[in-house]
Amino acid sequence: MMENYKHTTVLLDEAVNGLNIRPDGIYIDGTFGRGGHSRLILSQLGEEGRLLAIDRDPQAIAVAKTIDDPRFSIIHGPFSALGEYVAERDLIGKIDGILLDLGVSSPQLDDAERGFSFMRDGPLDMRMDPTRGQSAAEWLQTAEEADIAWVLKTYGEERFAKRIARAIVERNREQPMTRTKELAEVVAVATPVKDKFKHPATRTFQAVRIWVNSELEEIEQALKSSLNVLAPGGRLSIISFHSLEDRIVKRFMRENSRGPQVPAGLPMTEEQLKKLGGRQLRALGKLMPGEEEVAENPRARSSVLRIAERTNA
């Protein structure tokens, strides 16, 4: 079934170019998806190069297993655990680049059975790994109204969060929702002011998906681990699709691109300054898709690519 879904990789060349591939380097594709980035990385690696790919979606793992290449290996799990995967392979401090393509993929959105989209009726699931954790339906049926409202406000930036949360709880009390269409209809009715350019359920579906998959915590943990696993000169190449993701990536790169914060006039010896350490990253800027790419793939419109390099500090 998954073969029916065409996936166009956003900022493909730019993200891989951002890694500054060395033929004998060791790289991580933390979000394999349908393998667009991985295949391009492999095409630039020599015989001694290695690529470790990660994904928690069983369908992505099935696609990855069709790649018959001794330089390539796939791990079924969350990219937040990349530090553990690298340590298990005795590669701490030896990784030359990490690529992350954040958020939900087009095949996940387009497959109604995954439950990510309000445009297609399917089971109210939304899990990137359907074998683990609570589905969206299970969480919405058991969560408190205040908790649902908080999630909608925090992860969906939904201004009618309280009103929608109340409607969800009332509907589940009458008859538990199990379908995406049911949730979309409840949200539409509960939303007093409609945006003519956006479906009223857009923010709710984003928020519930982020919560169910712990997406922002996943990003924060992966970024934290990256400093430990990257070799000096190793690159981070990260694509975000909405402001919540990009804010985390931008803040991480900014904070780790600064040197030690020492109050002006505080007397310190050279030895003391060395112990404080220097900046750990050098931010190399950001890129956004061009008009041609957006025209071919409208989902690329909100994407942002940020690149940074590990320093010797």
From Swiss-Prot:
UniProt EC number: 2.1.1.199
GO biological process: rRNA base methylation
GO cellular component: cytoplasm
Top EC category: transferase
Keywords: Cytoplasm, Methyltransferase, rRNA processing, S-adenosyl-L-methionine, Transferase
Catalysed conversion reaction: cytidine(1402) in 16S rRNA + S-adenosyl-L-methionine = N(4)-methylcytidine(1402) in 16S rRNA + S-adenosyl-L-homocysteine + H(+)
Binding-site residues for S-adenosyl-L-methionine, renumbered to this chain: 35-37, 55, 79, 101, 108
One Pfam family, short name: Methyltransf_5
A GO molecular-function annotation: rRNA (cytosine-N4-)-methyltransferase activity
Protein location: Cytoplasm
Similarity comment: Belongs to the methyltransferase superfamily. RsmH family.
HAMAP family: 16SrRNA_methyltr_H
UniProt function note: Specifically methylates the N4 position of cytidine in position 1402 (C1402) of 16S rRNA.
NCBIfam families attached to this UniProt entry: 16S rRNA (cytosine(1402)-N(4))-methyltransferase RsmH
This protein's name: Ribosomal RNA small subunit methyltransferase H
Organism: Shigella sonnei (strain Ss046)
